[in-house]
Structures are given as C-alpha cells and as structure tokens.
Amino acid sequence: MNQRQNSSHHKRAVREARLAKLLFAFIAIASLAIIIFILNIPSIINNENNLLTKNVSTTQQNSSTTSEDKEVHTARITASGDMLYHDIVYGSAFDGQTYDFKNDYEQITPLVSSADLALGDFEGTINPDRPLAGYPIFNAPEEVVQSIKDAGYDVLDLAHNHILDTGISGLKYTANAFRKAGLDIFGVKVDPNEGILVKEVNGIKVAILGFSYGFNGIEASISQEDYNNHLYDLNMDKVKAQIEKAEEIADFTIIMPQMGEEYRLSPTDGQIETYHKMIEWGADVIFGGHPHVAEPTETIEKDGQKKFIIYSMGNLLSNQRIETLDRIWTERGVIMDITIQKDGSQTTLTSVQAHPTWVSRTPINRTFQGYPAYDYQVFLAEDYLPGAKYANTVDETTRQRIEKAYHEMLELLNGSSTNSVGGSNLTPN
C-alpha cells in the first residue's frame, strides 16, 4: 500500500513539474512577443502615418487636378491688315546708309504688344538676291522684320498673292527671316513636312491657318511639286481637311484668308460662301484680307457659340491713299482685338473690339529717286478724337480727317453701310 502511494505521488510530481515547465515556457514566449510588439509600435505608427500622408497627398493631387480642369483661361488676340511696302515707303526709310522703319508702328505698339498673341499680314517678300521692288512686284529690305517685331507682333501671315513675287527662294527667305527674328509664320511651308501652326496662349491652344485665292499667275513658273510643298491655296477640299485637323489638335481655330475684290467695301458672294463654309467646318474666327479696304463684320451662331468674321481688315501700312489712288478707304484699316476663354474643355469667343487705324504720311527733308520722301506712321484713330492723347499733335484739318476715318470705319464694320452683311455691334475700344 505504502509502495503504491509513493509511486502515485511520484507520478503526480512529474506531471506538475512538466506543467510548470510548459507554463514557464508560455509565459516566456508571451513576454517576448509583448516586448517585440512594444519595440515595433513606432514603426507601425510611422507606417500608418505614411499611409495617411499618401492618402492625403493623393486626395490633394486629385483635388488639384480637378481644380486645374475647372480653371478658366483667357487670352487676348489682335490681328491687323496688309503691310504693303511700296517703293516710296521703304525708299523714304533710307537715310543714305541704312533703312530705318522704327516710326512705322510706334503709335500702335502699346496696343499690339499688350496682346497675348498678335497676328500680322506681311504682303510681300524679302529676298536680298533680287532687286528691291514696291509694285507690282513686292520685295522689301530685311530691316522691316525688326520693326515688325519691335511693334509686338508674334506671328505673320504669308499666304497672299505676292508671296511668289521673288520665286520659291523668296518665299523661303521671307519665312526664315521672320523665324530668325523669333517670329512665327503661317500660310506657307519652308519644309513640306511642316504641320499646322498651333500657339499655346495662357493654356489655350490656338491653331492659325492662312490661304490665298491665287499667286498672280506666277505659280505657272514653278513645278507642281513646289506648289504642293510650299503653298496653301483655297482648294476647298484641302481647306476643309486643314480646318478639321486643326479642330482635333487645338482648342480654337483662327483663319486669315486672302480673297475678294480689291477696293470693294463689301464682300463678294464668293467670300461669303467660302467663309461660311469655314465656320461650318470648325473655324471660330476669320480675319479676312486682300481687298486693301475694310469690309463689314458678321457674327454667326453655331452650336450655341458665337463665331466671328471680318471680311477684310484693309491696309495697315501702305502708300495707297486719297492723294495717290483717289481712294480714301485705302489709308484706313483696323486692328481687331478679341478675347477668348477656355472653361474646362470648351473654348469660346467672349469679346470683340475694333481699333480703327489711319496711315499718316508727312514730308521729310530728303528725296527718293527724285521724288519727295515721307515719314509713314500708323495712327490709332481713337488717339486723335477730341481730347485724346494725340489730338493736339496734328493740325485740325488732319485731326478731323482721322476722326472721320474712325467713325466711318466703325459704321462700316457694324453693318451700317450699303451692301453690308449684318454687322456685329463691335465695341470701339
């Protein structure tokens, strides 16, 4: 009996010893786990903070992207008419050693340079390998480029009937002369692979196209290959394709076509039909040229948006005037001033203003090829209204001539003249 009891006590003692060891091992493992957890708390917190920061950053980025998508962008764009350097214009600028054109655009520089994008129309060529000429062939001194740049112009239209006056070499030299000065050109191609000119202006992509009705017959002297590689005409299938392409790659499309009847104060049926088709195909604004006088404007509603046409902006600079052609409208022009707005994916025309111009021609103390020379300047007509800043700088007869040009120009553009196309209720300035 005692032996049996001793054996039983021994077995119980062994079991208790094993349980004690197991309990001790469990406690040790649990303690170790707690210690490891405590030591890793900062890392866990840091990871959670990193995750939180990442989530907040992503949220902020998404918010920023949404904000950018909703941001409204605006841009002011100006456009003006023909720059025609007749021989007396460039000849008067020659002082015996150099050509100085700095006065030409001095008074319009504040307006032109204040625009986010300024478009001009250089009607002629620059080719130092050919003689200078000012009618019927136009070939100006290269010094004109700097004066145009100094006036604030950004882009020049070269699609016009005089671009072949000094051949394909003249076309290329003209384009490259402006590009060398930091200006863009459109309406011709130096490289056949050049695409549509698109200027990004304050976050708005603006496509600019130019087309000419013809090239004074000089195109017959070049190959078909050169014609196709370098010129943009008014082949309507090609025009349509260009406009549709512009609509794909830009937010807003501007066209500066050259067509119409010279010295006519209203558009031809062909102009109206052609420009309406351009609007139908996607153009937003059309700044017309070629007639050497201004023609009326028109606003068209399309898809709930306003589209704008000016059939001709007239001359900006030339020797054409009442004294030389007995045509008073040739000394008058207009600088168009529009504002466009991009809101999300939609870009619209929001305002249109007109700034009538007048070419001043005053005698200077020298001659050109035996003829009197002149100082040519483009005036902003609004600056010569009664009480305006330059009203007292000219004689009263001249001031009244400029004031008359101002009022009659706005009447013409707004459609108050005979044979108008409706007008646009333009704001004068």
Question: What is each of the regions a protein language model found here?
Answer:
Residues R15:
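Polyanion-binding surface elements
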